[in-house]
């Protein structure tokens, strides 16, 4: 399925983005990261819209869609990104990842209640597994790594920010699918232009605050490169995500995007091995969350099960 492929690409690029941000916030600040990573959005989305061959779609969106996409820009690109980067700064990618995957619960809940998508026993089991991952990390965090770390994790702060980021990120797929109004990929990319432009306007307004501008000017050239690159890459990730939810159900695409937790382990090992926690609990929690993703996307019809079991698994709610 093309939507599944787009979702998988979104997961990989999003995980790489978080690893790049982690590299930058080791010595830089979250404020510097979000201020420099947001402005690349409009040109990146606009280029994708032009390549889609239907740039005029941006003028065909309803007023409601425009407002929803603008709201997504502020909630996802500004607030969600701030919470996400703050969580990464406090506890690193590997500890923040399973908590951030709770965004899947938000997406599925909204998809069921507002988009009319269905919840099945398999999806319910997947949700339980996804929730179990962060719980395991929280209980085993003291023994998560035997070797000394180059940083001291701030667990309460990190988990709180990761949870808030999950709320913001979880609402986005449902809102994007709602705002595209069934008009396809070009509509989703048009919405991306609007969302990123709204987020950029907010960032420009924040620069009027003297302290914000002063902190931005203090960024080192090396960190500036990491933050700008992460901004460009995260919008590539968003392009894939927007296209995925435009052509496939949220209950399918959102879990696949959750595979970012698997990718982030390898990218973190590559870029910031001394600023992440690698241990049995971290890996086990990620595997459990991944199993939840697999279960959620599984189809009972494709499994060699007795008819009675298939009938039970075929139950839908609501």
Residue ranges and their predicted role:
Residues 169-173, 177, 181, 238:
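Extracytoplasmic gate region of multi-pass secondary transporters
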Residues 15, 46, 74-78, 104-109, ...:
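Hydrophobic/small/kink-forming positions within alpha-helical transmembrane segments
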Residues 10, 41, 100-103, 165, ...:
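Structural signature of transmembrane alpha-helices in multi-pass secondary transporters
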Residues 33-34, 96, 188-192, 253:
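Juxtamembrane helix-start motifs in multi-pass secondary transporters
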């Amino acid at each position: 399925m093309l939507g599944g492929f787009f979702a998988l690409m979104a997961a990989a690029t999003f995980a790489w983005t978080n690893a790049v941000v982690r590299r930058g916030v080791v010595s830089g600040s979250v404020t510097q990261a979000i201020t420099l990573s947001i402005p690349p959005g409009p040109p990146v989305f606009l280029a994708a819209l032009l390549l889609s061959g239907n740039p005029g779609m941006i003028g065909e969106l309803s007023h409601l869609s425009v407002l929803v996409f603008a709201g997504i820009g502020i909630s996802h690109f500004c607030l969600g990104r701030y919470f996400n980067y703050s969580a990464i700064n406090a506890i690193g990618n590997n500890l923040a990842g399973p908590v951030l995957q709770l965004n899947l619960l938000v997406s599925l809940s909204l998809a069921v209640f507002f988009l009319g998508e269905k919840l099945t026993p398999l999806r319910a089991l997947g949700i339980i597994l996804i929730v179990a991952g962060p719980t395991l990390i929280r209980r085993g965090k003291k023994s998560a790594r035997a070797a000394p770390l180059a940083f001291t994790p701030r667990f309460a702060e990190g988990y709180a920010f990761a949870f808030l980021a999950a709320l913001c990120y979880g609402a986005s797929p449902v809102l994007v699918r709602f705002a595209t109004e069934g008009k396809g990929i070009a509509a989703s990319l048009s919405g991306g232009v609007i969302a990123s432009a709204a987020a950029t306007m907010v960032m420009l307004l924040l620069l009027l605050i003297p302290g914000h501008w002063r902190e931005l000017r203090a960024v080192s050239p090396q960190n500036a490169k990491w933050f700008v690159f992460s901004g460009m890459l995260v919008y590539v990730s968003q392009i894939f995500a927007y296209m995925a939810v435009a052509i496939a159900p949220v209950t399918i695409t959102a879990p696949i995007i959750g595979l970012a937790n698997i990718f982030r382990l390898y990218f973190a090992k590559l870029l910031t091995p001394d600023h992440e926690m690698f241990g049995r609990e971290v890996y086990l929690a990620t595997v459990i969350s991944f199993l939840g993703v697999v279960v959620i996307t599984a189809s009972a019809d494709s499994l060699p099960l007795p008819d009675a079991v298939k009938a039970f698994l075929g139950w839908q709610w609501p």
